[in-house]
Amino acid sequence: MGGMTIAEKILATHAGKEEVKPGEIVLAKVDFMFGNDVTTPLAIKTFRKIGVEKVFDPERIAIVLDHFTPNKDIKAAEQCKFSREFAREQGIKWFFEGGNVGVEHCLLPELGLVLPGELIIGADSHTCTYGALGAFATGVGSTDLAVAMATGEAWFRVPETIKFVYEGDLQPWVTSKDLILYTIGDIGVNGALYKVMEFSGEVIEKLSVEQRMTMTNMAIEAGAKTGIIEPDKKTIEYVKGRAKREYKIYKSDEDAKYYKVIEYDVSKIEPQVAFPHLPENTVPISKAAKMNIKIDQVVIGSCTNGRLEDLRMAAEVLEGQKVAPWVRLIILPCSPTVYFKAMKEGLLEIFLEAGAVIGPPTCGPCLGGHMGILASGERAVSTTNRNFVGRMGHPKSEVYLASPYVAAASAILGRIASPEEVVK
């Protein structure tokens, strides 16, 4: 038997096999699954069509009403009501709305509902976030979610793995958001199509678990099936006291076969900005800051960069500063816990004094939902993960993706800017 990657080991175990090979199709037991207010209603309708009366296990399913909540209109309210009634009927334990809801990919790891070594599916494309914990986590359609809710299983084609190795010392102001943007800029939005992106190297080891989540979150933006990072002491420390189930640690074998290995010297990487209308359109900040690109709005938040460390970064730049005239700065902590801790640390005070609007935990403007939609001709710098045409509003608006540092600096100067221009 040849060596296997961490992703292959997780799939093999959950499929009840000793080994799997790329290209093989397996039926595997799923540890945890979830949907949101956009994807759950269709899954429920499909579940009804299957004709099963009860979900396979109400403790292994979550419904997180995070996209259009607090309800933005009647349709959103009806979607949430439909999902809520199903959760009550089925006795689904992990149902989140109102004061306990957070952006799903922040909330579920925080609560210990997704764990190392697990096989996780979610009816949301950024489910790959949990790969930061050493899980095989991937987005599925509502139909696959419905079948999994009924059976506890899902089918997978075993993907090949690309190993990314990051070495060297990070420059000032460079974050994991810059690393993943640089990577996508290098390989392209199809560069890891249906592959696993395995992130490794001394730089990844030094990143916090929250920073790692930013990287795995955006694996899908390179076309990947998922992103994954081997668990280490930091991972175990993160899940300690949170874990709702027992879990198992997997690591890639020394002789594991990779589709390819890509190495980066991070000392040459500076903060990145992804220009419209693809995350691969990356430009280093030294160049972007000189282009005098005026902006109308800045959004700091989302499942990519709405965690406590991200808000601390923003506060580091915003403290004692004011948002530029005619610029709207919207900050969305990604969970109630993050919101509460940001308040305790005085971050919210810094944001309010700077002239920011602080909203509740919601996906909101990231997908053009609400709480920060762009008009025709408007430009935004955002810490979110996608900048497709019309992603955050009007088809003739523009979205520039960046880290919390760059986003905060841009809000202050009213144009795409480097934090070095603000923090002396």
Curated annotation (Swiss-Prot):
Keywords: 4Fe-4S, Amino-acid biosynthesis, Branched-chain amino acid biosynthesis, Iron, Iron-sulfur, Leucine biosynthesis, Lyase, Metal-binding
GO molecular function, one term: metal ion binding
Residue ranges the record marks as coiled coil: none
Essential cofactor(s): [4Fe-4S] cluster
GO BP term, example: L-leucine biosynthetic process
Catalyzed reaction equations: (2R,3S)-3-isopropylmalate = (2S)-2-isopropylmalate
Amino-acid positions noted as binding [4Fe-4S] cluster in the UniProt annotation, renumbered to this chain: 303, 363, 366
Cofactor remark from the record: Binds 1 [4Fe-4S] cluster per subunit.
SUPFAM superfamilies: Aconitase iron-sulfur domain (SSF53732)
Transmembrane as UniProt keyword: no
Task performed by this protein: Catalyzes the isomerization between 2-isopropylmalate and 3-isopropylmalate, via the formation of 2-isopropylmaleate.
PANTHER family given in the database record: 3-ISOPROPYLMALATE DEHYDRATASE LARGE SUBUNIT 2, HOMOACONITASE, MITOCHONDRIAL-RELATED
Family statement: Belongs to the aconitase/IPM isomerase family. LeuC type 2 subfamily.
Name of the protein: 3-isopropylmalate dehydratase large subunit 1
Organism listed in the record: Pyrococcus furiosus (strain ATCC 43587 / DSM 3638 / JCM 8422 / Vc1)
Gene: leuC1
